[in-house]
Amino acid sequence: MHGGQGPQLLLLLLATCLGAQSRNQEERLLADLMRNYDPHLRPAERDSDVVNVSLKLTLTNLISLNEREEALTTNVWIEMQWCDYRLRWDPKDYEGLWILRVPSTMVWQPDIVLGNNVDGVFEVALYCNVLVSPDGCIYWLPPAIFRSSCSISVTYFPFDWQNCSLVFQSQTYSTSEINLQLSQEDGQAIEWIFIDPEAFTENGEWAIRHRPAKMLLDPVTPAEEAGHQKVVFYLLIQRKPLFYVINIIVPCVLISSVAILIYFLPAKAGGQKCTVATNVLLAQTVFLFLVAKKVPETSQAVPLISKYLTFLMVVTILIVVNSVVVLNVSLRSPHTHSMARGVRKVFLRLLPQLLRMHVHPRAPAAVQDARLRLQNGSSSGWPIMTREEGDLCLPRSELLFRQRQRNGLVQAVLEKLENGPEMRQSQEFCGSLKQASPAIQACVDACNLMARARHQQSHFDSGNEEWLLVGRVLDRVCFLAMLSLFICGTAGIFLMAHYNQVPDLPFPGDPRPYLPLPD
């Protein structure tokens, strides 16, 4: 057992000695490099030398885009490379040591900051170590969570896309002191934001369409001042509108459809129609308030969804106005309003045929003349009309009464005539007719009075029915008009969003895709 532990102890002591020796070499190298080293001085052998600083941005997470604050929050890794002639060494002098890890606060830094931050945090999240190679080149990859400003265009919200950027510049050095440039790989400049598929977390609201990078010179800032040169990383992102479609647009469309369906209520139910339309209007106001809390408070543009909600509110208000007008027309009567001939022709003949509506046909002219004769009457008290006219004007009960009355008189005359032309019987017959004449006349007058009253009531009911039919036709016309307006307006507004697509190329007029070449 003791013999098996001997080799293990020997290997452990050998590894400890080698580690201590290697650590001693790093300590010795670090002590040699940091001797008389000043991290505040620019690493230039001559004053005219320019230090080249390369930048590369790796995006790990697009956290959020706050539309109201116009702030983009991202989680990134900033890769910076530069060379410091004071940190060179010969690996042979340090037993082949090729990489030295040095705290970033101990070496000179190019003072690169995010120029368009919104929270005042210019520094990285963690000052990790830098990697120094024997030729003095430094590689630094600190992580950072940045909140950068992003101008929001709300014109097509929620079917919009935004162009955000992260602007990096040196806070203290001008173009004559350092030269900012994009990192290179295989002789090609990395003109895009690098995304590692294994480390990147997809955002649930935004999709990245383009991610170019550019080196820009600010024409406003003089070249001898800091901030003249900038490295800008762009993010062209498109919103995923499913959340707003499901939670705002679809419920609003369904609620607005209820306002359209109130036309299926009777024309006289104007009060119920106005109540339903008012409730729909209140619901649309709530949706508009929810949208207003999401978008920035700007007067430069009106969001597309706000335009649509306003359009639906206008349609609902028009429906309320239509309901009031239809109710006013439906409750008219011949005593208050006389129907013009043109109104009767358009709303009772022409439009019902076009709309395939079933309305009661208008009475023929012969019946109208008979009604006038019945109202005027004759001097003898009998209405001057034919049998066909009477059949068309009088109700069935009055026709039966009049028929029995006529049959009784004829039957009495026939009975008197059957007994022969005796003088006595003729005189008795004439006397009986003379005695019965006032009673018959009173009966006839009473029948004519009842007929006139019945006719007046029938005329009044017919007038009410005509106004009600006009209201029905007007209600149907308004329904078709509002339905067409609702469909066309909805389709037109959302077709505007369909044509608002992210361009195929990130910069107009520049044919380069700013993406890595395919393998």
Swiss-Prot record:
The keyword Transmembrane applies. GO terms for biological process: acetylcholine receptor signaling pathway; chemical synaptic transmission; membrane depolarization; monoatomic cation transport; monoatomic ion transmembrane transport; regulation of membrane potential; skeletal muscle contraction. The chain crosses the membrane at residues 241-265, 274-292, 308-329, 477-497. It comes from the Eukaryota. Residues 1-22 form the signal peptide. Its main location: membrane. The keyword Transport applies. It is found in: Postsynaptic cell membrane; Cell membrane. It holds the Pfam family Neur_chan_memb. Residues 23-240 are extracellular. It catalyses: K(+)(in) = K(+)(out); Na(+)(in) = Na(+)(out). Pentamer of two alpha chains, and one each of the beta, delta, and gamma (in immature muscle) or epsilon (in mature muscle) chains. Belongs to the ligand-gated ion channel (TC 1.A.9) family. Acetylcholine receptor (TC 1.A.9.1) subfamily. Gamma/CHRNG sub-subfamily. This is Acetylcholine receptor subunit gamma. The gene is Chrng.
